Swiss-Prot record:
EC number: 3.1.21.10
A GO term, aspect molecular function: DNA binding
Organism: Variovorax paradoxus (strain S110)
Active site: 7, 69, 141
GO cellular component terms, A-Z: cytoplasm; Holliday junction resolvase complex
Cofactor note: Binds 2 Mg(2+) ion per subunit.
Single Gene Ontology BP annotation: DNA recombination
Gene name as annotated: ruvC
Name listed for the protein in its UniProt record: Crossover junction endodeoxyribonuclease RuvC
Residues noted as binding Mg(2+) 2 in the record, renumbered to the chain: 69
This protein's record includes keyword Magnesium: yes
Amino acid sequence: MRILGIDPGLLTTGFGVVDSDGHALSYVASGTISTRHLGSGNLPARLKVLFDGIAEIAARYQPDASAVEIIFVNVNPQSTLLLGQARGACVTSLVNSNLSVAEYTALQMKKAVAGHGQAAKAQVQEMVKRLLDLPGLPGADAADALGIAITHAQVGRSMARLAEAAELSKTHAGTYRQGRSR
């Protein structure tokens, strides 16, 4: 399964694409979409750049699923609202590209990638490098996006195991009655 991970941001949005085949993860691509070249007063243009950029990435890499980091509530409510709009542009673009969208918090991603939810950016970058066998450290935004994709791959494996267990329990449920085998 090919997974597109997104770390939304109004100035810089990270993206990461990984392939998950059973227990193996492989790196496909990563990078950022930047709106820094646009003026700070040009919010609609920035949102369009994010929307179009995500659509282009989805068309180029043809992911089977996507995952997006859930935003945190910042001390500054205006910053939270702006980040929410950027995230909305990204999610809308993913849905418009006919992709399912899973959502994970930064804490969930850090725990899945680095082993604990309070991992520093540098620790996430190092673990993403190791998990995907990259030659160098990815940038912070790309590393977070790759981490979100890795988290979704791990959750997908867990859900597949649960589905298999549920199916197995259905086949064996009818063979036992009142504690005795038929």
